[in-house]
Amino acid sequence: MKSFLNICFLILGMIIFSLGSAIAGEIRFAQVTDVHYSLNNEFKQKVLTETVKSLNSDPNLTFVVFTGDNIDTAKESVLYEFLKIIQRLNKPYYLVIGDHDVFKSNGLSKERYVEIINEHKLFRNIKGPNYTFKKDGFVFIVVDGAKEVIPGTVGYYKKETLDWLEVQLKKYSKYPVVICQHFPIVAPKEVKSHSTYQAEKYIELIDKHENVIAVLAGHYHANGEKMLNGVYHITSPSLIVDPPSYKVITIVTTKGFSPMIYTELKRVEIK
């Protein structure tokens, strides 16, 4: 009887081990988008402050990504104040540039935006608005589609940007990849003024690479999730839309199976 029980425990242990080894990776993180932070706006300041507290209260979040329109007016003073608040986060955070974030004639170019980010040491120094980072076996690629000379609501991913993206997708071909950007290439709803220029070319590019599992975006101030050719396109609502909320995303990859992606909108309680 004793030997029988030992065999049962051995078999159970082997099953548990095999199940555990089959799971290639799991990660849980938050997406905050379209904060539109403004100076002298008590509501927006309070929303962002309470959002930071909410994010800090969740120990299971690996990091936070802000997917553009972090500030409402492209001025250094506004960006500095925004950074002052999000520096209270107790976990790593990453920034994407949106159409409200930069305006070269106003004195806040993409180059200067990146310089200010690097001054605050939010994460490792970056060379430009396009960059990558790794977390728990996943690769995240930040892709810039904003225009700094004449900012506008139409997203524009330059050829050199897409060429750079393709290089990264080849480089990280053995990793599950999540792309983070401001302008979606699969819109949550039809709004011509917010469309992305030649989105079909971008889609064709990622369709060539099996490692892309999701694309995160904002811009539309709307919640939307669509699957296209095996890639999960996630668009999240603006933080300042009533009720204020951000999105928690959990991704589980299992060998031999399609990735499982779970999302949850987390409401921010304003006190």
Please place each PLM-identified region on the residue numbering.
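N-terminal active-site segment of His-dependent metallophosphoesterases
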Residues: 20-81, 128
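Surface-exposed cleft-lining segments at the edges of enzyme active sites
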Residues: 38-39, 69-71, 146-157, 186-191
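Bacterial N-terminal signal peptides
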Residues: 8-18
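Bacterial N-terminal signal peptides that target proteins for export
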Residues: 1-9
